[in-house]
Each structure stands twice: as C-alpha cells, then as structure tokens.
Amino acid sequence: MELSTHYNPIEVEQKWYSHWMSQGFFKASPHSEKEPYTIVLPPPNITGVLHMGHVLNTTLQDVLIRKARMQGKEACWVPGIDHASIATETKVVAMLQAKGIQKKDLTREAFLAHAWEWKEKYGSIILEQIKQLGASCDWDRLHFTMDAGPSEAVKKVFIQLYEKGYIYQGKRMINWDPVGKTALADDEVNYQPVSSKLYYVRYAIVGSDQHIIIATTRPETILGDTAICIHPHDMRYQHLHGKQAIVPIANRTIPIITDTYVDKDFGTGCLKVTPAHDMNDYDLGQRHGLEVIDILNEDGTLNVTAGHYIGEDRFVVREKIAQQLQAEGYLEKIEPYTSNIGLSERTHAVVEPRLSKQWFVRIQELAKPAFEHVLDNTIQFHPAKFKHMYQAWLNNVRDWCISRQLWWGHQIPAFYLPDGTVIVAEDKAAALAKAHMNPVYKNLTEADIRQDEDVLDTWFSSWLWPISVFDGFGNPENQDIQYFYPTQVLVTAPEIIFFWVARMIMAGYAFTNRLPFKHVYFTGIVRDKLGKKMSKSLGNSPEPIDLIKQYGADGVRVGMLFSSPAGNDLLFDIKLCEQGRNFANKIWNAFRLIKGWEVQAKSSQPDDTMAINWFEARFNQVLTTIEEHFEQFRISDALMSIYKLIWDDFCAWYLEMVKPAYGEPISPTTYAATVEFLAKLLKILHPFMPFITEEVWHQLQPRSAQDCITVAPWPQSITYDNQLLEEAALSFTLITEIRNIRVSAQINPKEPLLLYSNTMLPAWFSRFSNYIQKLGYINQIAVSEGPIQDSVSCHVQGHAFYIPFQQKIDVEQELGRLKKDLEYYQGFLAAVTKKLSNTKFVEQAPPAVVEIERRKQSDAIAKIKVMESRLLEISGE
C-alpha cells in the first residue's frame, strides 16, 4: 500500500477514537489488581462550549491519564458536567423571553421543565467537543451535578452540617446581583477599578446655620442615611459631638456619632452612614444601634421606602439626585475619583450590598485541616507559589453564603411549618415525620409544609465532586470509593482556588477524613500574543473546533502545551498549532522514509553499531529527563524534550547516520533497531499526540485490534553511556561546523572535502569518523604537522580542524570571521563565568546544571585558545 505524502488527521482521528471506545480501553474497574490512578475532570458548565482554557486543561489531564494507563496503572478519568445555576437560569430566561414568555408568569415546575429541556438539547455539546480533542475519559462514568447520586449527596451533607451547627440561617449583609436577582458569595464578586465621581454634599446641622460637608461616591443612597459619623479625635468636628443633622432631599433628622473606624484623611473626614447599602456601614450601624433603611428593590430600582424616584434605576437616580442636590444648593463640588467596583462573576452586574436572610456555612472550623495539609505538603501544589495565595485566603475566610434566589439547582432541603419553624430533612415526608415527633405538630399534613424556595450555590455540589462521583455519600463502603479515592491529581485554573479547590479539600477531610487529591496542578491563563486574556467576547480567542479542523487535534494539543509552563500565563499564538501540525508531518515523513528502505541481509552498508548504541543511550538519557519533568509536573518541558529527541536526535542525526545510499539496501539489524526506536518514540509521544502515534504504530507493522499504543507499555529507562553521548555531541558539533563553512564559502553541500588536523585526532573522532565523513561529505581525513595553507578552520573542544581550498582564501575575510567568532566566545565565556561566580547559583542549582555550566566554561576557554592561535597563524604575527 502506497503511503500518503502528507499525514491527514481528519481521516485518522475519528477512526481511532471510535476504535478506542469500542475496545473499552478507557474503562476503569475497581476490581483491578493494578495501582489506581484517578483524575476527576473539572465539570464544565452545561452552558459552555469549548474555549482555549478547556483545551489546555483537558490536554494536560489526558497526557497524565494516558501515561498512567501505559505505565500499567488502572487509569480512571471521570468526566462530568455542572448544572451552573446562575449561568443556566440566565440562558433559559433569555430563551423564554425570545419566545415572549416571562419567568414570573410560570410556575416553578413549568420553568424547570423548560430548563431540563434546554439542558438535554445543549448540555452535552462541550462533552462532544472534548472528545474531539482525544480525551480518554471513562465515559460510562459520566456524571451530572443534578443526577440522583450527587443530588442525594448534597442533601445528606446539608443535613449533616446543619445538625452539627455548621449551617445556619441568618439575616446578614450579603452581595446581591440585581440582574440575576440572587445572593452571591464573597468570592463570586470580581473587583475592578472604575472611573467615577466623588460628590461633596452639605448636611445642615439642626438648631444652627452651620452645615457639614460629606464626600460620597453614591449620592443615590442619601435617601437611606441614618447617621453621620466622625472620628472622636478629629479636632475639626469636636463641636459637633452629640449634634444632629438633616438629610438633604429626605429632610430626615439623623444623629452625628463618633467612631474610630472613620478615616480622617478621606474626603472631609466625615462619613454618611447607610447601613442597608454598605457592608462597613452595616457593622457601624450595629455597634451604634442605628436604623436600617433599605431603599432598593431586588432589581436595583428604588422602592417606596426611598420616598423619591420610586421605580427608577439606581444609576439613573444617581445622576438625577446629583442634579437635584445642585439645584437645591446642597452640592458643594464634584471631583473625579477611581472606585473599586464589585461585579457579579456571572452577569457582570454591579453588585449591591444588601441586608438579606440567607443560608450560611460556618467555614472557619472546616478550613483548619484544609489549611494544615496544604502547608505541610500532604497535598502538593504545582507550582508551589500558589500556597501563599491559598494561605492568605484561608487566614481571612468568612462564612459562606450558600443560598441563591433561583429555581434551577438543588433546592434547599429546609421546610417551614405554619408557625415559621424550620425543619431540615431529605424531603417533605421526612420533614413531616420530624414535625410529628413534637405533639404540637401531630395534626400537620404535607400540605401544611412548604419547602424553602431557594437553591444552593452551585459550588455546594461541586465541593463534594471527588466523593460523590464514586457514590461516597450514598454508599461509603462501595468498591469505587475504596479503590479510586483519593484521586491523584486535580488540574485546574488558579482563579477557582477558593471557589473549588479549597472547598473540596475541606469536604474531603470533613466527610471522609482523607485528602481528595494528592496533587493540584494549576494552569495559567491563556492570553493572546499581545498578552491580553483570551475571550470570545473580546474577539481574540479562536474557535478550538476550527483549529482542530485546520491543524488536527494533535497539532492543537501540542500548540497549547508548547506555550504553557505550569502556573504561568501562556501567550498563545496560532503559529504554535502550525508547528504542532508540522511536527506530525515530520513524524509521518520519518516513518515513510523508514518504510521505504529495502532490507537485505547482504547489504554493503557499513556497520551501524555505533549509531545504534548512541541513539539507545540518547533515548534513555532523555527518557530519564522526561520522567523528572513529569514528577515535577513540568508537562510542557517533557513535551519539548520529546520534540527535540525526535526532530533533532532521531530525524536530523540518527536517520541520516544509518540511511543507506540511494538505491542501496539496509541491513536487517539496522532496520530492526530503527523500527524499534521509532516504536519507542511513538510510545513516549503518545500521551501528547495520541492520534498520529496510534496511526503510525499500526502502519509500522501488522497488529491486532487490541494491540494499540494506547495500552502499550511505557518504556523503562536503563543506564546509558555518558561518554558515548559526549563523544557523539562533539562529532555532531564538528559536522555542523563543516556544514557552516560550506555555507559561508558557498561550497556545494555534497562536494567532497579534505579535512586536516594539526594534532593527533582525538578518541571521539575515531569512534565517529565514519559518520563525520558521511554527514560532512569528507572524502579524506589526515593529520598535518605544519600549518595548512589556504584553509578555513573550525574548533571543537580545543582541537583545530582545517578544510583546504584549491583557490587561495581571502585572508581578510577569514580574519574577520575568526575575530567575530572570538568576540562571541569571549562574551559567552564572560557570561558563564559570571554565573559560576554567583555563590547562590552554585549552591542552590542542581549539581548537573552547575556541571553543564562548568563544561561550557572550559569548552569556551579551549575554543578561544585555538582561535587566538589561528589568528596569529594566518596574520603572520
């Protein structure tokens, strides 16, 4: 069968993914005697479609799980999808509005019917896209956060925490989303600086013709003011202690109070206190027993309590009230000001502090083991720098607001009796049974009980995810949870370190007394090549599916990983996907070259034992490095090591060393070794580029349907000959120098040349002389005691080599070249010497790294010595 000149990923990818699925390669069993290796996919939202962050996260997980599978572990990658309360409800409401249907006109049941219909239609889109990337999940284990199992887990945990006193209901200041019309947790609010205004407003002092000036960024909340506060030691306002003031427009009398909370240097040093609409003002009001006047509706419009501008939006009122203050003589001045505004993570609405009755989790006690076990490295963060962020948050953790004023989600398992008594139970029947335990309620029926209408924060199901996907709450002794939990690694983004990572660790210790995962690998933020965060809304993010169609899934995977150092933001350039595709073509062409060779036992080809031994050593050297990279979660570094091993060492050197002359056969020994090398290279590349490696694996030799690289054994590194590697590297340096001389002298690449040395040839040269002659197109090698006239020199490890020309060389040109090279190596030597003179580097860097730098230094010194000698020689000095 004639092989295509180009690798075609479209023809290959669907074929092999379907084959892997049909063979059950991705299925994991708790009955296995293998070592388990478990990853739980961070469940994407059902509202989502694949974006570049998903591509990065999914690729990294697939690399880890495929490698573990090849290493003989029971690799279990559990996929899932999240119900995403706020995001999904927003989508469903918009869909209904487009049909002329308002949510307020529907019953809860009718709305949820629409939501489930929407979920069935759109909820699996992103999962199908993830499959196109090659994700080797155990799809039989697919979970949805509102499936029966996770839903029961949520109820059990809520009841358990409530009964232990960790969950409570209380009226507190919370973050309110006026667009989503729901409460938000503190970490669901994103803060960003916004250009605004500082309004200086006059408040008249009761019983005098004096006034006090107060600076505020929110004049619309004046209508809810219940006090003015000054610092007790601010001498400017000593005369106002115990006085009263009049609220402009509202004409309400309020007290002037004192509190050290006031910042004397902000504005005028006086603070208007609006307890209903500011977190700090509320705390101040509680200390001083102030009235709380809520002037806003849940949608951010002014309510009847405001007394003015009823039904108008808060930001419209801001402008109108400023104009009224100006017209009535209350506005002293307006200054530009930069405010830090809180925005809803989901709807991007400006968040309103609001006094509201909500459900909360007391988090401080639950956080203690989560804090300790990360700091002592029981759970390891990669990179470790994220421990500091994690520690700072847990040191200042606040109670978690878990109720949301939505319909889509897990309805809170709390039930109200007619007198307002709250009973927490699995369902109405269980709540009624609990009520009947009290004789007062013995005549109640289910019709007398109503369930809390709110749903739980989406993260309340997500924090249980590593346990609930294995039914660890419904059946804590089942084989899945006993075998697959805890998981090995969580791959996630640092922006949800608080939302999800910290809470999962809390849940792990609270409900299983074990860690949920052993490692957390934090990806970076995907940015464009200009450094801007990639976003479809900004128009700077490509469609991953379009990239897959153009470059192949392998090309896109490699492109992402080429640009993604762990924990650091990555600058993505579409050219990296092109580089990934080119790499696939390089592998395909190497395979075609090998398959095109004729194999004959009586081949006249010279013995290639040295080349075979060298590449075997080089493979094991790089494999050792790759394993070190994986241990430290430097996944991109591991890929780059493989890339260089294949592109440079295998294709550029080894294949050229053993390639037979045109029309000549290759020996069976060399051919077999070469095929085996390619097979081993395909194995270590497979986790990164699963499709092309599987295709070439099967093309390389006949195989059964079950004999797939997906389940082939991962190569084991063995000891290797360092001296052989060093000698080969020197030989390759010499060949490269010869090639460079050809280019600079405009000599045909294949024109045979003479090569002289004025010293005895080194041992490394002798061992690789056949390949130096073959790849350098050298037809004669000799030693000359005297100088070689009309020649160009090159230098390797202190040895000078000369290539004579039939025509006289341009002495000035050769002097210029030597001086330029000398200048470069002198600068190089200075840089290396500076690094080695740094005590901190020498003491803290790995010994192997320091040794490499010392070798660079000695090599540079030797080269400089030879070049200086050659300069003297040809200049006649």
From Swiss-Prot:
Domain notes from UniProt: ValRS has two distinct active sites: one for aminoacylation and one for editing. The misactivated threonine is translocated from the active site to the editing site. The C-terminal coiled-coil domain is crucial for aminoacylation activity.
Species whose genome carries this gene: Amoebophilus asiaticus (strain 5a2)
Taxonomic path: Bacteria, Pseudomonadati, Bacteroidota, Cytophagia, Cytophagales
Keywords: Aminoacyl-tRNA synthetase, ATP-binding, Coiled coil, Cytoplasm, Ligase, Nucleotide-binding, Protein biosynthesis
Membership in a protein family: Belongs to the class-I aminoacyl-tRNA synthetase family. ValS type 1 subfamily.
EC number annotated for this UniProt entry: 6.1.1.9
Protein name per UniProt: Valine--tRNA ligase
Coiled-coil regions listed: 806-826
GO biological process: valyl-tRNA aminoacylation
Functional note: Catalyzes the attachment of valine to tRNA(Val). As ValRS can inadvertently accommodate and process structurally similar amino acids such as threonine, to avoid such errors, it has a 'posttransfer' editing activity that hydrolyzes mischarged Thr-tRNA(Val) in a tRNA-dependent manner.
Reaction catalysed by this enzyme: tRNA(Val) + L-valine + ATP = L-valyl-tRNA(Val) + AMP + diphosphate
PROSITE patterns in alphabetical order: AA_TRNA_LIGASE_I
Motif ('KMSKS' region): 533-537
A Pfam family: tRNA-synt_1
Highest taxon, organism lineage: Bacteria
Sample GO molecular function, one term: aminoacyl-tRNA deacylase activity
Location of the motif 'HIGH' region: 44-54
GO cellular component, one term: cytosol
NCBIfam families assigned: PRK05729.1, valS
Compartment(s): Cytoplasm
Record note on quaternary structure: Monomer.
CDD domains: Anticodon_Ia_Val, ValRS_core
Gene3D superfamilies: HUPs, Isoleucyl-tRNA Synthetase, Domain 1, Valyl-tRNA synthetase, C-terminal domain, Valyl/Leucyl/Isoleucyl-tRNA synthetase, editing domain
Residues that bind ATP: 536
Signal peptide positions (record): none
